[in-house]
Amino acid sequence: MKAKIVLGAVILASGLLAGCSSSNNAQLDQISSDVNRLNTQVQQLSSDVQSANAQAKAAYEAARANQRLDNQVTTYKK
């Protein structure tokens, strides 16, 4: 008796899964397209952030170099 119930449950579950997998291919394609578009945007934003960080670091180092030069000029004045 238990074997029949388990077999019935397996058949019912496989039927439900087969029905769900083929019903919304258009929606699945749309969602896949949206995910790919969002992944592209995330990669672009990540690249932009890395570029901005590099520019900020370069500006900081330039300011430090200018400060060192200013300090040298004040110490060597006669």
Curated annotation (Swiss-Prot):
PROSITE patterns: PROKAR_LIPOPROTEIN (PS51257). One of its GO terms (biological process) is lipid modification. Sequence repeats lie at residues 25-35, 39-49. GO terms for cellular component: cell outer membrane; extracellular region. The modification N6-murein peptidoglycan lysine is found at K78. It is a lipid-anchor; Peptidoglycan-anchor. The keyword Ribonucleoprotein does not apply. Keywords: Cell outer membrane, Cell wall, Coiled coil, Lipoprotein, Membrane, Palmitate, Peptidoglycan-anchor, Repeat, Secreted, Signal. It holds the Pfam family LPP. Disulfide bonds: none annotated. It is found in: Cell outer membrane; Secreted, Cell wall. Residues 28-62 form a coiled coil. A lipid is attached at C20 (S-diacylglycerol cysteine). Residues 1-19 form the signal peptide. One of its GO terms (molecular function) is peptidoglycan binding. Its main location: membrane. A lipid is attached at C20 (N-palmitoyl cysteine). Homotrimer. Belongs to the Lpp family. PANTHER family: MAJOR OUTER MEMBRANE LIPOPROTEIN LPP, MAJOR OUTER MEMBRANE PROLIPOPROTEIN LPP. A highly abundant outer membrane lipoprotein that controls the distance between the inner and outer membranes. The only protein known to be covalently linked to the peptidoglycan network (PGN). Also non-covalently binds the PGN. The link between the cell outer membrane and PGN contributes to maintenance of the structural and functional integrity of the cell envelope, and maintains the correct distance between the PGN and the outer membrane. This is Major outer membrane lipoprotein Lpp. It comes from Proteus mirabilis.
